[in-house]
Curated annotation (Swiss-Prot):
This is CREB-regulated transcription coactivator 3. GO terms for biological process: energy homeostasis; lipid catabolic process; macrophage activation; negative regulation of adenylate cyclase-activating adrenergic receptor signaling pathway; negative regulation of lipid catabolic process; positive regulation of CREB transcription factor activity; positive regulation of transcription by RNA polymerase II; protein homotetramerization. It is found in: Nucleus; Cytoplasm. The modification Phosphoserine is found at residues 4, 62, 162, 273, 329, 332, 370, 391, 396, 410, 443. Residues 129-148, 375-478 are annotated as: Disordered. Binding, as a tetramer, through its N-terminal region, with the bZIP domain of CREB1 enhances recruitment of TAF4 to the promoter. 'Arg-314' in the bZIP domain of CREB1 is essential for this interaction. Interacts (when phosphorylated at Ser-162 and Se-273) with 14-3-3 proteins. Interacts with YWHAE. Interacts (when phosphorylated at Ser-391) with phosphatase PP2A catalytic subunit PPP2CA and regulatory subunits PPP2R1A and PPP2R2A. It comes from the Eukaryota. Residues 405-415, 422-431 have a biased composition (Polar residues). There is a cross-link at residue 232 (Glycyl lysine isopeptide (Lys-Gly) (interchain with G-Cter in SUMO2)). GO terms for molecular function: cAMP response element binding protein binding. Its main location: nucleus. PANTHER family: CREB-REGULATED TRANSCRIPTION COACTIVATOR (PTHR13589), CREB-REGULATED TRANSCRIPTION COACTIVATOR 3 (PTHR13589:SF4). Transmembrane segments: none annotated.
Length: 619
């Protein structure tokens, strides 16, 4: 009797039965829970498939439409109006999409059958955010070999490649549909999906039975016919908003593409919503010069930064009393004028018997290097020996101060087939670089002064010139150039540059130069062999010519120029500073002409070594 109270709890058989009952009950609950979860999973998967079937014909982006899943969850077969209104908020309020019936009013029917909304959906889920089931019928489109002349290329060329610019394809105001008659109203709205460019060029689409339209043929990866491409190119670009044009590869590239329109119309691809700045073609503004005396030659006072204008600087053949001369260095830039900031007056006062032979004007400003053709500046003194280069744009005079600034500004190219320029004097044109073999006519491009503005224009025919005087061969290893530097009579130069006194002088190989010849002397002067082109020491600078400052390496390197520039408020030379005229480089902001020349792919960029040279000199 004493053991009876504890017999129930101490009996191992009853204890094991309780454990078995508990385990059985737990297993039943687990099975019920698993069955419930399986049912929920199946129903959820089925619901997602239905939602995906219904939404892929309206949702063209790659992001899931959360608002549509929330709004239309209770019903599985909504009308076409309710599902189509979601396109306005497809990008979560970021992009406003116009309604489809704004452009195609004939395609909307209020009494559509629920089963009709899947018919003819030829692009089922090419943009869907979730991977489709592989059991779906996927096949190659049967129209891959067709080329129908009725392609609606307006919307095809307006197609986009990113979600942020999908809204622009619906802004085409001219939907040219050859099938827009009454027979098309029997088709529901899903057929118009290709009009908005919502297929990303996939080769495989989920095909459903139903009539095919000609817009659906735009999925063909083969190149379009060339006549269709060229006929629709300008029209599609004109109807496109400017804010969505971005340069890049074409949406439908092919070998026969009309490349003649590309510099003016840009490319057809719009890979985003960034503005296209490559199609901006504004006329160049009038040059605003600080010097009022530059009004006649004002267009040459537009100086730009280093390397911006690749073919604009080496044409000036100006001989002043300082002997500034520039020779042609590149045959490919024979029709371009200089962008040099010649906005200062290079007034040189010839004083042959005084120590300060040439007093520079206070408003002297060195021209800014606007061309890779003039990467550095070469001023060669009266001594014809080779010297190590001084820093760029440093005017270094000779040891004899009374000789004046007789220098030669020459531009030589390491890869130029004609490194030596043949300098002759002529009485015809002040600034002419004419290839004698091509008999070309040099004409200024539009941004420069017109021939009506110039007293003696640059347009000179070769037959109007006298036969050039041959130069004695100074360096026998250098071949003579086809480009001849024609320096003209003083009257034409002074009328062309009103602020510059051009005093022509014969240059002799002796170290001391004679007195300067007056300006009225018209006869030909014998070109001396002191005018010879030295080879460019910067041979590693690629195909761009570089000229550098060379002078005697003695202690009197800067004495002559320091004496000549003494007392000038704007120009100060220091014997210690390697680049004394840094503040005098008037580098003006880049103009639209410079932008156009920069965007030209035919122009080459600066060599990295040349760029590093200027960066080292704090230019």
């Amino acid at each position: 009797m004493a053991a009876s109270p504890g017999s129930g709890s101490a009996n191992p058989r009853k204890f094991s039965e309780k454990i078995a009952l508990h385990t059985q009950r737990q297993a039943e609950e687990t099975r019920a829970f698993e069955q419930l979860m399986t049912d929920l999973t199946l129903s959820r998967v089925q619901f997602q498939k239905l939602q995906q079937l219904r939404l892929t014909q309206y949702h063209g982006g790659s992001l899931p439409n959360v608002s549509q899943l929330r709004n239309s969850a209770p019903e599985f077969q909504p009308s076409l109006h309710q599902a189509d209104n979601v396109r306005g908020t497809r990008h979560h309020g970021l992009v406003e999409r116009p309604a489809r019936n704004r452009f195609h009013p004939l395609h909307r029917r209020s009494g559509d059958k629920p089963g009709r909304q899947f018919d003819g959906n030829a692009f089922a889920a090419s943009y869907s955010s979730q991977h489709l089931d592989e059991s779906w019928p996927r096949q190659q489109p049967p129209w891959k070999e067709e080329k129908h002349p009725g392609f609606r290329l307006t919307s095809a060329l307006n197609r986009t490649n990113s979600d942020s610019a999908l809204h622009t394809s619906a802004l085409s105001t001219k939907p040219q549909d050859p099938y827009g008659g009454g027979g098309q109203s029997a088709w529901p709205a899903p057929y118009m999906g290709f009009c908005d460019g919502e297929n990303d060029g996939h080769a495989e689409v989920a095909a459903f039975p139903g009539p095919l339209k000609e817009e659906n043929l735009l999925n063909v990866p083969k190149p379009l016919p060339k006549h269709l491409w060229e006929s629709k190119e300008i029209q599609s670009l004109s109807g496109r908003p400017r804010s969505c044009d971005v340069g890049g590869g074409n949406a439908f590239p092919h070998n026969g593409q009309n490349t003649g329109l590309s510099p003016f119309l840009g490319t057809l691809n719009t890979g985003g919503s960034l503005p296209d700045l490559t199609n901006l073609h504004y006329s160049a503004p009038l040059p605003a010069s600080l010097d009022t005396s530059d009004h006649l030659f004002g267009s040459m006072s537009v100086g730009n930064s280093v390397g911006n204008l690749p073919a604009a600087m080496t044409h000036l053949g100006i001989r002043t009393s300082s002997g500034l001369q520039s020779s042609r260095s590149n045959p490919s830039i024979q029709a371009t004028l200089s962008k040099m900031a010649l906005s200062s007056s290079l007034k040189c006062h010839p004083q042959p018997s005084v120590a300060n032979a040439s007093a520079l004007h206070p408003s002297l400003r060195l021209f800014s290097l606007s061309n890779p053709s003039l990467s550095t500046t070469n001023l060669s003194g009266p001594s014809r020996r080779r010297q190590p280069p001084v820093s760029p744009l440093t005017l270094s005079p000779g040891p004899e101060a009374h000789q004046g600034f007789s220098r030669q500004l020459s531009a030589t190219s390491p890869l130029n087939p004609y490194p030596a320029s043949q300098m002759v004097t002529s009485e015809q044109s002040p600034l002419s670089f004419l290839p004698t073999d091509a008999q070309a006519q040099v004409s200024p491009p539009p941004p420069y002064p017109t021939p009506q503005e110039l007293p003696q224009p640059l347009l000179q025919q070769p037959h109007a010139q006298e036969p050039p005087t041959q130069q004695p061969q100074a360096a026998p290893s250098l071949p003579q150039s086809d480009f001849q530097l024609l320096t003209a009579q003083g009257s034409a130069l002074t009328s062309f540059f009103p602020d510059v006194r051009f005093d022509q002088q014969p240059m002799r190989p002796s170290p001391a130069f004679p007195q300067q010849v007056p300006l009225v002397q018209q006869s030909h002067r014998e070109p001396q062999d002191s005018f010879h082109l030295r080879p460019n020491p910067y041979s590693s600078c690629g195909s761009f010519p570089g000229t550098i400052l060379t002078e005697d390496t003695n202690s009197n390197l800067f004495k002559g120029l320091s004496g000549g520039l003494s007392g000038m408020p704007e120009v100060s030379l220091d014997m210690d500073t390697p680049f004394p005229l840094e503040e005098e480089l008037q580098i003006e902001p880049l103009s639209l002409d410079g932008l156009n020349m920069l965007s030209d792919s035919s122009m080459g960029l600066l060599d990295p070594s040349v760029e590093e040279t200027f960066r080292a000199d704090r230019l």
